[in-house]
Amino acid sequence: MARDVPASTPAGDTPTLTKAELAELLFDSVGLNKREAKDMVEAFFEVIRDALENGESVKLSGFGNFQLRDKPQRPGRNPKTGEAIPIAARRVVTFHASQKLKALVENGAEPDLAR
């Protein structure tokens, strides 16, 4: 499912796919009405967000994995003063692309993730 890159994208800038554009693509390709397409995109991201909030990993076959990682406290430094300050422990979300997605991106192929 290819999409047209807007003509207004300045040279050198990477085009960005937004949630609104995802909904528009669903509208065009699947035949949902615009409201249903927008709701489906929102629901998809809500399910992923809820799973991550509950400490679960999210695995999307052929696309990649979202995982939580706990980073321990570590020493840091104020760049202006050079003063040593601790960087607090935190939890972060990481994304690891699948081998299939990596191959599609590397080969410059039009990704058809519905396969």
From Swiss-Prot:
SMART domains named among the record's database cross-references: BHL (SM00411)
A single Gene Ontology CC term: cytosol
Superkingdom: Bacteria
Gene Ontology molecular function terms on file: DNA binding; structural constituent of chromatin
UniProt GO BP: DNA recombination; positive regulation of metabolic process; regulation of DNA-templated transcription; regulation of translation
SUPFAM superfamilies noted in UniProt: IHF-like DNA-binding proteins
InterPro entries, per the entry: Hist_DNA-bd, Histone-like_DNA-bd_CS, IHF-like_DNA-bd_dom_sf, IHF_alpha
Record flagged with keyword tRNA-binding: no
Alphabetical UniProt keywords: DNA recombination, DNA-binding, Transcription, Transcription regulation, Translation regulation
CDD domains cross-referenced by the UniProt entry: IHF_A
Family listed: Belongs to the bacterial histone-like protein family.
Function: This protein is one of the two subunits of integration host factor, a specific DNA-binding protein that functions in genetic recombination as well as in transcriptional and translational control.
Subunit structure comment from the entry: Heterodimer of an alpha and a beta chain.
Protein name stated in the entry: Integration host factor subunit alpha
Gene this chain is encoded by: ihfA
